[in-house]
């Protein structure tokens, strides 16, 4: 495996390439890189595995005396390889909850009332937008899809950046209130009490948060109704998919939250007026499960901006990397708010523009979970290795590990890993192309 040909090599990279080329354990090192999927920032570990009192594995014999494992970062901009694996797991998790018949989810859930809903943030000031009907923006321009002005405030002096950050900060709590309100609306529409509705039915969901160009999160969610005690059963209160969609819209409009602004004032936060619902199952589907799963999985690997990381919460440096001014202003507002009483925690979420929730969340009964998917993958990989039939399987296996560092030891190793990553990516794309060609 050689370094990518279009990269200008510095002396440090050349020295690293030469050293690895002469390394007698080079092939084992490349095998480790492949096993991590050519992770951009692999974690290097030193350790030993014992079966009883007898060592069965040690990193002493590995290249550089270390074992490399994935960094596990879900963000595409940080590690495309780990993001690809996370995206695949998320697709399986989301799809199983819609289609059923896999990952321990009963087939019957596919016939339950199910809606794909998008809940938006409200407006905190006019921004540059691109209209689907071809009309010009309020600034008089018809913006292209990749226009850098999209999402930027038309008048930064009047845009309410503080309220925008507070909305992101409280968005997870607003979602929780929406779920409570949805049950109330469903019970009211069915003519039963909330308690009776919960005894007969249950709401299951999976949602992903998506950052818009204006720096505010939207929620995209699959919302499904099940029986209260068993997700294999239909909800005990009869509800059509259309009725569920209407209840979602009503509940979103009724949901609100009052937030302290830290300066003695309060702000009422709500979802935006734009709300989209599409039927997935029940009385008739408007969009297929595969498309929705791919949509949710794609956004599960996004961040507030590809040039913003959790290690850098200084908006002054963001400008140098081309981060839009809208996001820089929101970060500055988050820093300012974090100095106020009751909002100190905001300082740890500047890189997320105040959003402190997980990008992907689900209810317990919706589907499988990431831990199970990862355990299944680890078991599958273990089965691919040659078993040692001389080992006593009744003896406990213990591992003792020490963290050595993250990333490759030198630029040359990083370049070689980039070449492996390119090869793996090309192989995946070729496989996808082959699947698209009809036989």
List the model feature ranges, each with a label.
Residues 215-221, 255-282:
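Acidic/histidine-rich catalytic neighborhood
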Residues 129-166:
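A solvent-exposed, charged loop/short amphipathic helix patch at secondary-structure junctions
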Residues 1-87, 271-439:
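Long, low-complexity, charged/polar intrinsically disordered accessory regions
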Residues 63-114, 119-136:
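Long, contiguous juxta-domain segments that are non-catalytic but functionally important
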Residues 79, 117, 196-230, 296:
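Histidine-centered divalent-metal-coordination microenvironment in nucleic-acid enzymes
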Residues 64-68, 102-107, 191-213:
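Catalytic micro-motifs at enzyme active sites that drive phosphoryl/nucleotidyl and oxygen chemistry
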Residues 222-264:
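Helical (often loop-to-helix) elements that flank the catalytic cores of nucleotide-handling enzymes
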Residues 168-200:
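A short, contiguous, amphipathic alpha-helix enriched in charged residues
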């Amino acid at each position: 495996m050689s370094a990518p040909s279009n990269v200008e090599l510095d002396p440090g990279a050349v020295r690293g390439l030469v050293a690895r080329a002469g390394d007698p354990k080079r092939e084992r090192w490349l095998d480790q890189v492949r096993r991590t999927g050519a992770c951009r920032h692999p974690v290097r570990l030193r350790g030993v595995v014992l079966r009883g009192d007898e060592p069965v594995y040690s990193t002493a014999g590995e290249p550089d005396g270390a074992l490399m494992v994935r960094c596990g970062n879900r963000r595409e901009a940080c590690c495309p390889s780990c993001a690809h694996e996370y995206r695949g797991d998320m697709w399986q998790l989301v799809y199983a909850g819609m289609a059923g018949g896999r990952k321990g989810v009963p087939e019957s859930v596919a016939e339950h009332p199910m809606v794909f809903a998008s809940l938006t943030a409200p407006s905190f000031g006019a921004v540059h937008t691109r209209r689907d009907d071809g009309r010009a923006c309020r600034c008089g321009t018809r913006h292209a899809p990749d226009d850098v002005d999209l999402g930027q405030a038309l008048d930064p002096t009047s845009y309410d950046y503080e309220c925008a950050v507070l909305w992101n900060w409280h968005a997870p709590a607003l979602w929780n209130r929406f779920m409570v309100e949805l049950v109330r609306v469903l019970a009211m529409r069915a003519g039963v009490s909330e308690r009776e509705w919960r005894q007969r039915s249950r709401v299951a969901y999976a949602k992903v948060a998506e950052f818009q160009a204006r720096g505010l999160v939207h929620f995209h969610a699959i919302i499904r109704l099940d029986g209260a005690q068993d997700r294999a059963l239909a909800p005990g209160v009869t509800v059509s998919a259309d009725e569920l969609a209407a209840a979602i819209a009503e509940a979103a409009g009724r949901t609100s939250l009052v937030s302290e602004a830290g300066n003695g004032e309060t702000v009422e936060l709500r979802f935006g007026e734009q709300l989209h619902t599409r039927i997935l199952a029940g009385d008739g589907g408007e969009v297929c499960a595969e498309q929705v799963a791919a949509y949710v999985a794609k956004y599960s690997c996004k961040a507030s901006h590809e040039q913003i990381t959790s290690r850098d919460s200084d908006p002054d440096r963001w400008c140098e990397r081309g981060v839009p001014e809208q996001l820089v202003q929101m970060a500055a507002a988050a820093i300012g708010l974090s100095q106020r009483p009751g909002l100190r925690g905001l300082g740890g979420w500047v890189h997320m523009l105040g959003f402190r929730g997980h990008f992907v969340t689900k209810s317990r009964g919706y589907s499988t979970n990431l831990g199970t998917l990862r355990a299944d993958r680890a078991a599958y990989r273990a089965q691919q290795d040659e078993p040692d039939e001389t080992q006593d399987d009744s003896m406990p296996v213990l591992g003792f590990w020490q963290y050595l560092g993250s990333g490759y030891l030198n630029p040359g190793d990083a370049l070689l890993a980039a070449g492996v990553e390119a090869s793996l990516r090309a192989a995946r794309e070729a496989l996808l192309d082959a699947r698209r060609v009809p036989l």
